[in-house]
Amino acid sequence: MVLDEIVRHKKKEVEEKKRIKPVEELINEIKGGYSGNFKKVLQKEGISIIGEIKKASPSKGIIKEDFDSVKIAKVYEKVDVDAISVLTEKEFFKGDDNYIREVKKVSSKPILRKDFIVDEYQIYESKILGADAVLLIVSVLGDKLRDFYNLSKSVGLDVLVEIHDRQQLEIALEAGCDIIGINNRDLKTFNVDINTTENLIKYIPQNTTIVSESGIKTPEDIRYLASLGVDAVLIGETFMKIIDDIDKISDFVKEAKGGG
């Protein structure tokens, strides 16, 4: 199973990082409080769009050959994307922690660190890198979710909590999570079904901010999700395929938001 392999590899990677820089050193480097910028842009009127910076994935392999995180961030800065998701997972998604720092230099958009967080160390690290929010995946963390969620909040990060089924949703709601990401991709099989959002959204309280992730390919998909009550969408592969054509991506965003 790909997810198990990713988690095993990530745990080893974090242990290596701890040997190089102990968690105590990391905590001492933390500066700045809570900005709330990520949550704010998701809650504004109309549907919000999170554009992802992603070179590869286990299911698709290399998505963007001539990958340049700064160039992509500059495109997102120019079009009406509301936040940026930065993939930092190295082994399976060809990401890098430094992409967050690079993007932060050229973009004013709030940044979500997208990785497989398995250790509290990564939460402190995310804050130091300059992320405004982190992704916590219920299928990875299970009953550790509440502690990881509370720690993230305590260091000044918003938290996108990812679920894929009803059981995971209940865990997220019991932990008091205020931003729920419905992943239309099953991380066990990597199969995608955009109807996952429709099937689960009815169980989510109205005061929760809802993000739909994966399998979103057209402006029509986004308008459909908005009609269900989704507050934001996260788009990776679809944008990576057209990122070199700023007019095309700008038109896509305008049409998705109802202005095209």
Swiss-Prot record:
Enzyme Commission number(s) from the entry: 4.1.1.48
Pfam families on file: IGPS
InterPro entries recorded: Aldolase_TIM, Indole-3-glycerol_P_synth, Indole-3-glycerol_P_synth_dom, Indole-3-GlycerolPSynthase_CS, RibuloseP-bd_barrel
Pathway membership: Amino-acid biosynthesis; L-tryptophan biosynthesis; L-tryptophan from chorismate: step 4/5
GO molecular function, one term: indole-3-glycerol-phosphate synthase activity
Domain of life: Bacteria
Reaction catalysis annotation: 1-(2-carboxyphenylamino)-1-deoxy-D-ribulose 5-phosphate + H(+) = (1S,2R)-1-C-(indol-3-yl)glycerol 3-phosphate + CO2 + H2O
GO biological process, one term: L-tryptophan biosynthetic process
SUPFAM superfamilies: Ribulose-phoshate binding barrel (SSF51366)
Family designation: Belongs to the TrpC family.
NCBIfam families for this protein: PRK00278.2-4
Protein name (database record): Indole-3-glycerol phosphate synthase
Source organism of this protein record: Thermoanaerobacter pseudethanolicus (strain ATCC 33223 / 39E) (Clostridium thermohydrosulfuricum)
Gene name linked to the record: trpC
